[in-house]
Amino acid sequence: SDLINAFCHRDYARMGSVRFLVDDDGLTIANPGGFIEGVSEDNLLTAQPRSRNPQLALILKAAGYVERTGRGVDTIYAGSIAAGGSFPDYSQSSAEEVILFLRRVVPDEAFVTMIGDEERRRGAPLPVWSLIVLSLLREHRRLTMVQLCDFSHLEHRRIVSAVENLVEAGLVEGDR
């Protein structure tokens, strides 16, 4: 999904290539053109989906390269977290280019197994919001709702809903 997003959302009015770099630190993907108007690093997951190149997005969907248009970033986050990795890093992006960095990590096998078991039990993938909460709790062990919102850059209502679902599933314990 990250490779497809780079080609689908690049600014074709700008010169330059989509660049991929795999090194000891991880995978970096850079494409010409900053984020689409109204989208920033802080609202990538919650901004209204829009494509810079809607015809290309439709072609990629028709060809089977994407399941749903407008959900590429969600898929990138979910895939990275569910594989035991860290959050995708867009912090080096600018008005001239979007840069995605996926850090190389040794997957936490217990975490990956827990996610896989829960997804099999549900018969569906965990929502990206739940994966974000689980990842943050794996890293920090104990967080308040305010801290979860701060670390995730997500709205309180999304975090509350995700935590409630995770508590109900028995994956996390909540304090009152």
Model-derived features: positions:
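C-terminal regulatory or interaction extensions
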Residues: 1-176
